[in-house]
């Protein structure tokens, strides 16, 4: 095998290995909106702490999460969280003790909503 052929083979192996490693990367944490309304705001706090994150729906292309839509969540580590959920009609509710796992989907449904202000 010539030196050029050997170099090309090594490069192809490196590229294939990199592509394989990227394919193994997880899908990240996602919120699945199973409520009957469009969510316009989601803030997370470590369970019981009342230290709310920024509005996570702002990362969505239309800045809201429709029924049955999933939203990729970034900047949050796996753990137990409370969620503050807001709707366009000014209603805001809390969901307590959501277990968020790495590379997994967590859902919020109407039955999970507590302490709604309307």
Model-identified regions with their sequence ranges:
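Structural beta-strand segments of beta-rich domains
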Residues: 25-29, 69
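Short acidic/proline- and small/hydrophobic-mixed sequence motifs that coincide with surface turns
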Residues: 37-41
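Sec/Tat signal peptide C-region and signal peptidase I cleavage site
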Residues: 17-21
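Intrinsically disordered, low-complexity Pro/Gly/Ser/Thr-rich segments with frequent PxxP/GP/PP motifs
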Residues: 50-78
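Asparagine-centered strand-capping/turn motif at beta-strand->loop junctions
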Residues: 29-36, 46
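Structured interaction patches on ligand/partner-binding surfaces of diverse proteins
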Residues: 22-23, 86-117
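Bacterial N-terminal signal peptides that target proteins for export
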Residues: 1-8
């Amino acid at each position: 095998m010539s030196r050029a052929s050997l170099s090309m083979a090594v490069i192809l192996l490196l590229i294939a290995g990199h592509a394989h490693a990227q394919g193994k990367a997880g899908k990240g944490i996602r919120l699945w909106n199973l409520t009957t309304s469009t969510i316009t705001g989601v803030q997370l706090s470590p369970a019981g702490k009342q230290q709310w994150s920024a509005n996570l729906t702002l990362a969505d292309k239309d800045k809201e999460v429709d029924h049955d839509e999933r939203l990729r969540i970034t900047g949050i580590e796996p753990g137990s969280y409370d969620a503050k959920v807001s709707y366009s009609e000014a209603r805001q509710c809390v969901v307590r003790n959501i277990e968020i796992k790495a590379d997994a989907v967590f859902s919020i449904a109407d039955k999970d909503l507590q302490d709604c202000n309307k």
